[in-house]
UniProtKB/Swiss-Prot annotation:
Main location: cytoplasm
Post-translational modification: 4'-phosphopantetheine is transferred from CoA to a specific serine of apo-ACP by AcpS. This modification is essential for activity because fatty acids are bound in thioester linkage to the sulfhydryl of the prosthetic group.
Subcellular location as annotated: Cytoplasm
Protein name from the UniProt record: Acyl carrier protein
Any GO molecular function: acyl binding
Pathway assigned in UniProt: Lipid metabolism; fatty acid biosynthesis
Keyword terms of this UniProt record: Cytoplasm, Fatty acid biosynthesis, Fatty acid metabolism, Lipid biosynthesis, Lipid metabolism, Phosphopantetheine, Phosphoprotein
GO BP terms, alphabetized: lipid A biosynthetic process
Length: 80
């Protein structure tokens, strides 16, 4: 899976989970500051990403994922 494919899939999931227009979701979008996510939204988003990409995101790692780009980078590293 290429970085672009991961980015598109992450953006789609973020858009759906946070009920925002897909055009608003960019690589540098911060989940809380730019997209209006609260802490519960963030937990649900992490769970959705884990399911969609069949990976596990430990709590420590999840705390470091603040933007769409952070999520893409983490998934890329996990999927190798």
């Amino acid at each position: 899976m290429s970085q672009e494919e991961i980015l598109q899939k992450v953006c789609s999931i973020v858009s759906e989970q946070l009920s925002v227009e897909s055009a608003e979701v960019k690589s540098d979008s911060n989940f809380q500051n730019d997209l209006g996510a609260d802490s519960l939204d963030t937990v649900e988003l992490v769970m959705a990403l884990e399911e969609a990409f069949d990976i596990e995101i430990p709590d420590e790692a999840a705390e470091g994922i603040a933007t769409v780009g952070d999520a893409v980078k983490f998934i890329e590293e996990k999927k190798g």
